[in-house]
Design a protein with these regions (language model features):
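Recognition helix of helix-turn-helix/homeodomain-like DNA-binding domains
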Residues: 31-45
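Short, charged recognition helix plus adjacent turn
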Residues: 1-3, 33, 64-77
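Helix-turn-helix DNA-binding elements, focusing on the entry/boundary residues of the two helices
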Residues: 22, 33, 51
Length: 77
């Protein structure tokens, strides 16, 4: 099984470069700030729909810059 994880450090760098906050991103993605926090800390993994929203809201950011694909055994692909 393949899992997709958010690269939280990269996301935070991207937000800093854009001078935007996690709350701004949560608002633009139409999710709660609590859910955004869970995505960033790794408590939750982004669904395909959430991944699509990240890429739409953070226009110009590549998939591989934000997400990491892992096999169920934890290895990176």
């Amino acid at each position: 099984m393949v899992k997709v994880a958010l690269k939280a450090k990269n996301l935070l760098r991207i937000l800093a470069r854009k001078n935007k906050s996690q709350n701004w991103l949560a608002y633009r993605m139409e999710i709660s700030s609590g859910y955004m926090s869970q995505l960033i800390t790794g408590a939750r993994r982004p669904s395909p729909k959430m991944r699509e929203r990240f890429l739409q809201v953070l226009d110009g950011v590549a998939f591989d810059e934000l997400f990491e694909i892992r096999e169920s055994n934890g290895r990176k692909r």
